């Protein structure tokens, strides 16, 4: 198996391909990306045998912005016989995976694949039984063992491979299943909820998303992101010239500041969070967020960068590099992560956390 298969958002295949090519080259692993427009996946084929497995192990999945899942696969299985699709799949995995912890039979995230997904659900049960019989899967699910993936791109055609449990998305198809709250002011609320799940470990929520914290939402109207902060029992300064949802104002936790988010200067010195989802050029938002960190106006930030029509990966990379340089020049140590979330559109979401620079692992007390 000498290929890396990456799931991505439909329409962002070129960005996904550019990113994996660059990340592989940084590790002196070379190959070429096979890209089909609007397919919702990318195949990166390594020139040397064994390098796909090496890349899967060495490239942190958390570093990838445009990928929803990363697995190593072999050649495409074509024209699987309708009466016996299982045998070729088992044959592809024999000697490659032993005692896998889970099985996911998946498809690209496109409208055309929805019908195929129904077949995948039915196919999973007999395939799992066969893989367990042959020792490719354990007789029980284990989060500590490799995940077996069967990725159907068409009826009778699939890629077969595996991902590593500590370096993959734990989600089926890499997609979170979040329910839109009926009382939220806008669907954008799901972006911030997903960002919390992606960027903040679940066992740190009570500390880093704690009740009673102060937060600032720049460009808050009508309050989709403010809603998530209120749900975590935070106090929020919502900055926007537009109106906020009355339901949020009635909580007593929201203070509406009718100002331009770029001109607003906080009056409190204990804001833990700043969040921002403004429709603006990405370089302006990136600079603004870097300034908030440099000035010590917050400890963590989550914000969206709206992407141009062309050279989207390059745009994101340049803005992240600028933020990193600006923070470094001011002696600020920070963790920076970015991801095109499932609920994002033509944008990526960035998370920055100040960390204590004097002692590794110590929290930033400013």
UniProtKB/Swiss-Prot annotation:
It is found in: Cytoplasm. Its main location: cytoplasm. Monomer. This is Ribosomal RNA large subunit methyltransferase M. GO terms for molecular function: S-adenosylmethionine-dependent methyltransferase activity. Belongs to the class I-like SAM-binding methyltransferase superfamily. RNA methyltransferase RlmE family. RlmM subfamily. S-adenosyl-L-methionine binds at residues 188, 221-224, 240, 260, 277. The lineage of its organism: Bacteria, Pseudomonadati, Pseudomonadota, Gammaproteobacteria, Enterobacterales. GO terms for biological process: methylation; rRNA processing. It catalyses: cytidine(2498) in 23S rRNA + S-adenosyl-L-methionine = 2'-O-methylcytidine(2498) in 23S rRNA + S-adenosyl-L-homocysteine + H(+). The active site is at residue 306.
């Amino acid at each position: 198996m000498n290929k890396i298969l990456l799931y991505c958002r439909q329409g962002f295949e070129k960005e996904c391909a550019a990113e994996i090519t660059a990340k592989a080259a940084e590790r002196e692993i070379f190959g070429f990306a096979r890209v089909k427009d609007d397919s919702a996946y990318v195949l990166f084929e390594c020139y040397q045998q064994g390098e796909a497995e090496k890349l899967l192990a060495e490239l942190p999945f958390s570093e990838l912005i445009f990928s929803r899942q990363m697995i190593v696969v072999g050649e495409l299985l074509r024209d699987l016989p309708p009466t016996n699709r299982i045998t070729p799949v088992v044959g592809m995995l024999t000697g490659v995976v032993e005692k896998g912890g889970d099985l996911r039979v998946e498809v690209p995230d496109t409208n055309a694949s929805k019908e195929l997904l129904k077949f995948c659900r039915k196919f999973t049960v007999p395939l799992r039984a066969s893989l367990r019989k042959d020792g490719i899967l354990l007789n029980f699910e284990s989060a500590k063992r490799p995940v077996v993936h069967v990725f159907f791109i068409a009826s009778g055609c699939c890629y077969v491979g595996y991902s590593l449990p500590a370096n993959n998305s734990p989600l089926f198809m890499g997609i979170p299943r979040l329910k839109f709250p009926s009382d939220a002011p806008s669907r954008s609320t799901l972006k911030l909820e997903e960002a919390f799940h992606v960027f903040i470990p679940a066992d740190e929520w009570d500390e880093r998303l704690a009740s009673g914290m102060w937060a600032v939402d720049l460009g808050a109207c009508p309050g989709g992101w403010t809603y998530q902060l209120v749900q975590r029992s935070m106090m929020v300064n919502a900055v926007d010239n537009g109106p906020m949802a009355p339901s949020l104002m009635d909580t007593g936790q929201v203070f509406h500041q009718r100002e331009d988010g770029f001109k607003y200067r906080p009056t409190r010195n204990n804001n833990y969070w700043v969040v921002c989802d403004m429709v603006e050029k990405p370089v302006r938002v990136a600079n603004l967020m870097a300034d908030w960190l440099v000035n010590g106006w917050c400890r963590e930030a989550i914000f969206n960068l709206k992407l141009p029509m062309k050279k989207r990966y390059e745009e994101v990379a340049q803005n992240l590099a600028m933020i990193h340089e600006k923070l470094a020049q001011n002696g600020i140590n920070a963790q920076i992560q970015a991801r095109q979330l499932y609920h994002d559109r033509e944008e990526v979401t960035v998370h920055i956390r100040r960390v204590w620079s004097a002692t590794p692992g110590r929290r930033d007390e400013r």
